[in-house]
Amino acid sequence: MALDIHAHRILILDFGSQYTQLIARRVREIGVYCELHPFDMDDEAIREFAPKGVILAGGPESVHEANSPRCPQAVFDLGVPVFGICYGMQTMAEQLGGKVEGSELREFGYARVDVVGKSRLLDGIEDHIDADGLFGLDVWMSHGDKVTKMPEDFHILASTPSCPIAGMFSDERRYYGVQFHPEVTHTKQGGRILSRFILDICECEALWTPSKIAEDAIAQVRAQVGTDNVLLGLSGGVDSSVVAALLHKAIGDQLTCVFVDNGLLRLHEGEQVMAMFAENMGVKVIRANAEDQFLNNLAGESDPEKKRKIIGRTFIDVFDAQSNKLDNIKYLAQGTIYPDVIESAGAKSGKAHVIKSHHNVGGLPEEMNLKLVEPLRELFKDEVRRLGLELGLPYDMVYRHPFPGPGLGVRILGEVKKEYADLLRRADHIFIEELRKADWYHKVSQAFVVFQPVKSVGVVGDGRRYAWVVALRAVETIDFMTARWAHLPYELLETVSGRIINEIEGISRVTYDVSSKPPATIEWE
């Protein structure tokens, strides 16, 4: 009998680092299941989780300050390998009898560490070998404190001039700590270091693969749903599309999708969704044409937050009206993904609390009285995309740029009108089409056009044109928390601008947004 894909698992304890989710994604990429839990996870829960190894993540606090986070004692009682990263190394050192102090020289950014100890973790892994035969690694540092005394039976693993104990290890106990961040791409050998810990030291088997995830998710859905019927709000976005494909494969005609066409979608998006799911895959999809209802409700409103709420409430009204026409629906499917689950863990007094269910549809009427099916709730976004490909969805659909829930409603500044939406749809289509032609679409993380309710004078032929202004926006980012504006070639911008002004009569001027995040947000509203 094949092993359950969750059988070999890693526990990651979160001490508040901005990189913690990145650690989890790296572990999953290696092919091993892991879960992120708050540092104050109780001992019994840790024992029940039964990990094959534990990673103590970084954090912003100082170990030597009162009430700073500590690793649960149960971790050190499990008898499994432990890997402390940055703060994780410091709390491990302090809790096992070592000492941590503040450092006069803080290390932030690129650094080179010398590998001075022969350990299972770093044996044969290096970026440089100097004239004296000393191995070196190019790494990313982000710390102010440092370990000044190691626990008994530990040895120095790595060092820098300002941080003599930049890494420590005990091969006998299988405990390792590094002051740098192996999870970020700036640490060139980071992937190899994590693989060494997880596959070799923890002896995990790479069971977490797209094909096995698909098989497991299909089996789980069938076990949960049985012969009951399921309702899904299909938006055409990546998450809901993958849920639709997965559920259709699992339960076939027991699935009914409601696609709400709010009049704020991209050009031909409604037709594309229906063609993909209803025509090609045979999924039962109800298309609710609610453009007038959305636009009427939005009339006269220019406040961005109020527009979002109106769009959200109207979606619920339309979705509810459609669901009431259906019989014997017992389950509501949602595209909740793992970051949603993590983020819905509250934070009081700087301490994370128990993870609770996250409802990404947000506010669907409780009187619907439906049970939830969330087949993606264990997956990160990149895993959802790989699962989509595994299920047969087209690459271009799975790797589309993100599109906001309120759609063009937040890309039209001020009041939303049908005229504005129609102009914006066409301009956006031209921009994306030219990005694809120039092989830039997948080089940027997100690209779109923003409609500005400002008119500008233009000249077309011998005539004067007084028409609207639009802005092009393209950004590059890894995590969407920070982003830089994309340095698109001038020739490409010229082509896009020329096409928009020449082909769309209502637009006379095109600008390019050169704001990064922060201080600007990616979307304008």
From Swiss-Prot:
<feature type="active site">
    <location>
        <position position="183"/>
    </location>
</feature>
<comment type="function">
    <text>Catalyzes the synthesis of GMP from XMP.</text>
</comment>
<dbReference type="Pfam" id="PF02540">
    <property type="entry name" value="NAD_synthase"/>
</dbReference>
<dbReference type="Pfam" id="PF00117">
    <property type="entry name" value="GATase"/>
</dbReference>
<dbReference type="InterPro" id="IPR014729">
    <property type="entry name" value="Rossmann-like_a/b/a_fold"/>
</dbReference>
<feature type="active site" description="Nucleophile">
    <location>
        <position position="86"/>
    </location>
</feature>
<dbReference type="InterPro" id="IPR022955">
    <property type="entry name" value="GMP_synthase"/>
</dbReference>
<protein>
    <recommendedName>
        <fullName>GMP synthase [glutamine-hydrolyzing]</fullName>
        <ecNumber>6.3.5.2</ecNumber>
    </recommendedName>
</protein>
<keyword id="KW-0658">Purine biosynthesis</keyword>
<feature type="domain" description="Glutamine amidotransferase type-1">
    <location>
        <begin position="9"/>
        <end position="207"/>
    </location>
</feature>
<keyword id="KW-0315">Glutamine amidotransferase</keyword>
<feature type="active site">
    <location>
        <position position="181"/>
    </location>
</feature>
<feature type="domain" description="GMPS ATP-PPase">
    <location>
        <begin position="208"/>
        <end position="400"/>
    </location>
</feature>
<comment type="subunit">
    <text>Homodimer.</text>
</comment>
<keyword id="KW-0547">Nucleotide-binding</keyword>
<dbReference type="InterPro" id="IPR029062">
    <property type="entry name" value="Class_I_gatase-like"/>
</dbReference>
<dbReference type="GO" id="GO:0003921">
    <property type="term" value="F:GMP synthase activity"/>
</dbReference>
<keyword id="KW-0332">GMP biosynthesis</keyword>
<keyword id="KW-0436">Ligase</keyword>
<comment type="pathway">
    <text>Purine metabolism; GMP biosynthesis; GMP from XMP (L-Gln route): step 1/1.</text>
</comment>
<dbReference type="InterPro" id="IPR017926">
    <property type="entry name" value="GATASE"/>
</dbReference>
<dbReference type="InterPro" id="IPR025777">
    <property type="entry name" value="GMPS_ATP_PPase_dom"/>
</dbReference>
<feature type="binding site">
    <location>
        <begin position="235"/>
        <end position="241"/>
    </location>
    <ligand>
        <name>ATP</name>
    </ligand>
</feature>
<dbReference type="InterPro" id="IPR022310">
    <property type="entry name" value="NAD/GMP_synthase"/>
</dbReference>
<dbReference type="GO" id="GO:0005524">
    <property type="term" value="F:ATP binding"/>
</dbReference>
<dbReference type="InterPro" id="IPR001674">
    <property type="entry name" value="GMP_synth_C"/>
</dbReference>
<keyword id="KW-0067">ATP-binding</keyword>
<dbReference type="GO" id="GO:0005829">
    <property type="term" value="C:cytosol"/>
</dbReference>
<dbReference type="Pfam" id="PF00958">
    <property type="entry name" value="GMP_synt_C"/>
</dbReference>
<dbReference type="InterPro" id="IPR004739">
    <property type="entry name" value="GMP_synth_GATase"/>
</dbReference>
